[in-house]
């Protein structure tokens, strides 16, 4: 009888240990994987230009859902940097210099991240944005735009679409 009690206690311990080791982090310190920009720093996007258009959602992860299956999107390019986006990691304030664009072949990409609590730009903040795009004439083909947050349940949305040039320097 004593050996049965020991076995039951041992199994109970294993179950409790397994439950306590389960990673169920709801603090926002983890999150969804968002790619970083790749390639060399872009040197050919020196002219100021603004592009706008509609991006359509192609993927969604996470318990929280913005419900945005499409969105109006603006992208500002100047001095090899981008501003714009939907969540603010690319937006910044009036004195925000923009996010560095990188180039690999004919594709451009940019990544930015910030902490929503204090607005500081850090490498692994709770708000992340990534964009990969090509430019042909007055058109930007957004291969993927990824927006991710880790607060309020968190989510990661991926969008793609086409943007058209709306202004440039001197217009």
Where is each model-derived feature located?
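Sec-dependent bacterial lipoprotein signal peptides
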Residues: 1-20
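Small side chains
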Residues: 12, 18, 53, 84-85, ...
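Bacterial Sec-dependent N-terminal signal peptides
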Residues: 16-47, 167-169
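Contiguous, well-ordered beta-strand patches that form the walls/edges
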Residues: 83-137
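Short, exposed beta-strand-loop hairpins at the edges of beta-sheets
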Residues: 138-158
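Short, low-complexity, Pro/Ser/Thr/Gly-rich segments in the mature regions of secreted, periplasmic
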Residues: 160-171
